[in-house]
Structures are given as structure tokens and as C-alpha cells.
Amino acid sequence: MPVIHSYIVAYDSGFAPNPFNGFCTLATCKPDIRKRASLGDWIVGTGSNRQGVRRGGFLVHAMRVREALTFVEYWNDPRFEKKKPNLHGSYRMACGDNIYCPLEGGGWRQLNSYHSGEDGTAVQKHISRDTSVDRVLISDDFVYFGAEGPKIPDVLRDAGLVLSGRGRKKVEEPASIANFETWLEGLGVKGYQGRPFDMVEAARKRK
């Protein structure tokens, strides 16, 4: 029986998860979810309520886990070549999450990415945390709303789908999962539907 792993997307940049190029992928951050989620489970990200965002209780994304790859498999898979970041390209190219290139002697080279320093240097803290769980979650059955998602109904909030702080909530009650799937299906859309919050803010500041 599938379960729901719910968490708050503290920084909705399009990096974790990355909803571009036909797949929603979770390759960085959230090692606990990447470790524990099984194929068929749902991963649900809800909005942050921090100052300047105020999207608490709104759906950012929902992805059904279809595949789980190692970092080496993810790096070498041609389907995910476009998820290797290019910070000098478009916004979508810049927030690529395929950032760990395996080294011959072991270890990883971290591509210049959202987990690198401002000068492009590798950040060991992120390398250690990201690669502590050698598992990248892949979904082609997802919806991503970013900053423009619907409010989650009270019946699902009451079931524990929306957290009040950091961490992960595991929803296992079959009726709650069925209610969530019915609601999600009723939205009538799939795939990439809206821009990440940070992308919206960047566009607003350029005006």
C-alpha cells in the first residue's frame, strides 16, 4: 500500500525537486525521504509560511515515485542529461539537480550549481548530506505548481498532510491517501504547471 511523505518546501527554486524536462526528480536535500520512500509512494511538498513567501498550506508539488537511481546511474542516464546545470543558461538550465559526477578514485565532483558556493566552488557540507543517501527519486507521474498551487483542503490538512515546521510527515491511513488521490485527480492537470516561487520573484524584481 503506498504512503504519502509530506514536507514543507522551504526554498522553492526548481532545484529540489526539479520539475523540468518531463520528470520531477529529487536528487538533493531530503535524505530521509530519499532513503525511505518506496516505489509507488507519493512525495508531497507544501508551501513555506516564512515571511516574504506566505504559501503555507498550498500545494507546491506531488510526485509518485516511479524509479530510484544511484547517483552514478543518474549521472550516466541520457534522459537526465538536460538536468546537469548550466548557471549561464536559462533559469531552467541553471537549477539542474544532476550535479554529482563520479570520480575514478571514488567520491564526487560537484558541478557549479545551487549547492555550490557563490564563486562556484564545491560545498562539502552539501556534498556530504546529498550523497549520504545514494538514491535519486524519479517521477513521470507528477504535478508541479510552484508558487501558483491550490490550497490543500481542510480534510487533507486534518489528516496531517500539511506540516507546521521542518521534518517529514508520513501519512499511512488508506482513507486519507484515497482522499488525496481523488482530490489530486480532480485538479485535472499533470506535469509542470507553474513557476517556482524563486523564479516568480526574480521576474518581479526585474520589472
Q: Which residue stretches match the model-derived regions?
A:
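Compositionally biased, charged N-terminal/linker segments
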Residues: 1-38, 194, 199, 205-207
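Short beta-strand-centered aromatic/proline hotspots
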Residues: 57-68
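Contiguous surface segments at macromolecular interaction interfaces
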Residues: 71-207
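Residues that flank catalytic or metal-binding motifs in active/ligand-binding sites
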Residues: 3, 59-61, 140
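Short coil-to-beta transition motif at edge beta-strands of beta-rich domains
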Residues: 34-50
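Short consensus segments that form the blades of beta-propeller domains
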Residues: 51-55
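Short loop/turn segments at secondary-structure transitions that flank enzyme active sites
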Residues: 12-15, 49, 66-71, 150
